[in-house]
Amino acid sequence: MTDASKDIVSVRSLTKSYGATVVLKGVDFSVARGEIHALLGGNGAGKSTLIRVITGTAAKDGGELVFRDMAGNILTEADGRRKVAVVHQELALLPHLTVAESIALPHFRKGSRVYDGRTAGSQAYAALSMIDRDFAGTALNRLVGDLSLHEGQMVEIARALSSGAELILLDEPTANLTAAETERLFGVLRKLTRGNGLSVVFVSHRMKEIRQIAHVCSIIRDGRTVVGNVPTAELSDLAIIEHMGQAQATAVAHSARPAPVASLSDEPLTIAETGFSVTLQPGTILGVAGAPAGPETLIAALIGAAHERRWTVTRAGWPDRFRSPREAARLGAGFVTGDRSHRGILHSLPIIDNVLASRRATRGSLFATKREEVECLDLMQALKVKAGSLWHLPNTLSGGTQQKLLLARWLNVPSRLLVLEEPTRGVDIGTKREIYQLIRDMATTGTAIVWWSTENAELLEICDQVLAFDTEGRSSGVIERDELSEDKLATLTGMAA
């Protein structure tokens, strides 16, 4: 039991419903000052809704929500929420603003109509210096659009500090970061919690990272707290998985990889650049490893997203280079983006139109037929997608369920090649295993898979061979299944295992 007077925020018996769907069913949760607190739970458990209630973007239906200041005094909910900030997986920054403008923006929203560049620069430098003095000295006049994702996170955290935040909620902050960037982020969080008394809620599905950074953890399952404020070191990975209700799903991960069976086509694909090529047989899963520069260039060429002259894709009936993603899709080359929020999910269209998007692109149809509606319902059931209606918007679904929708697009059209960009990014362990099995099943139909992941353990588990890129973005070799290892991948990519 924690001392309530030391909690920066605490909720008791919190409830929240959306229509007939009860999302939070009596959640208890508290965060102490200076603490890094891991919030765990499967997709759809209620984590995002809890965050929305704490930050005030959703109103609670029942229960108690208490904020305290640094002295332990109880604040009104309105005052308390001014001390809370969220850094989402998809950053909320305007690319055309400078770093200084982005950090100082909340101050000018509060009343001043005149932008004072000198004041903005001073405020931004003071906040950013708390994180990284060297970065603060060089970044203020840079455009946000020119920053790396890690640098953008630093700007968001600095903006929160500049606004007086005492609690920062980080939602899957490492999903798009390299190992080195992740370690730098962890260093920043440790510095701020120890030296400045900041409190952090860290939402992640990565067990290793949770153990590296979090002091305590709480687990939500089906809208209820099943583990509250337990020291992370006291819980094994298996115990965490069981509390999340995903022990059975994890066991599936150790099943043998089914042998590929080519039934769609017996034509192989050859992916080539000057002096190098790799042949991808139907039903084969080719992993792609390395820093983003190489994989991103390859993927752009595979799906016709750029006039990339470096790579060619050879297959009977296909051009050497697709002119556009639409042409690629029409000829049977699908793509699932790693940026589901901005480039994947069609937020203004219902679930059924999201699932049928690839069919629309390849066949030109506009409206769902009754037969397509039935097929879509069957597909949702097979994928274990829980949705009240096919006509609901996808924003009502968890991140993992949205990821299933993106994959479902290519289950209802014949595909000879499917290119996957970080397909399990930001999903829980159970959903990850379901995606593994889904891709294995697609491979057995003869679909060739190209799978880019920054998680080497994932590539080792799922792939038949791995194409590696070095830190300069150059292809450095192909590793066959029987030679795959963490050390081999680290050697060819130049990145630590």
Swiss-Prot record:
The keyword Ligase does not apply. The keyword Endoplasmic reticulum does not apply. It is a peripheral membrane protein. SMART domains: AAA (SM00382). Keywords: ATP-binding, Cell membrane, Membrane, Nucleotide-binding, Plasmid, Repeat, Sugar transport, Transport. One of its GO terms (molecular function) is ATP binding. ATP binds at residues 41-48. Pfam families: ABC_tran. Belongs to the ABC transporter superfamily. Ribose importer (TC 3.A.1.2.1) family. Probably part of the binding-protein-dependent transport system y4mIJK. This system probably transports a sugar. Probably responsible for energy coupling to the transport system. This is Uncharacterized ABC transporter ATP-binding protein y4mK. It comes from Sinorhizobium fredii (strain NBRC 101917 / NGR234).
